[in-house]
Amino acid sequence: MSGEKEDPIKLHKQGNTLCDTGQYEEAAEKFLQSSELYEKKGNFFDASNMLFKAGECSFMLKDYKTAIERFNKSAEIAFKKGFDRFGVSALEYALDCYKALGKEKDKEVVELQKKIKNVKKKLASQLF
């Protein structure tokens, strides 16, 4: 692996630039590479964030199934490390993908909605 590919911050920035110019496939690749490196370094928030950004790229490309996978993985990492608000955001985007696929009545969607509701309830109870 070259030095460039080993630097998650550089890959992250390259992904942002590619995304800003509408090069979503290329951006998603940079974000995925960055996510792996962040995770290896123990930076789980940025690992989750990069998966989220890769999910956004897939969403922009209308590849909703891939976007769902990426948003779910992002949420999984976020919840595991206590970043519950971020995890909820990822799940809400996954929900948008299911809606775009016309699957808002599917069992997975109902379960996802329950999970989002429960996490939001938990977060609200922590405010006081």
Task: Annotate each language-model stretch with its function.
Residues 38-44, 79-84:
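Flexible helix-coil transition and linker loops at the boundaries of alpha-helical arrays
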Residues 4-40:
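Alpha-helical segment of the N-proximal tetratricopeptide repeat
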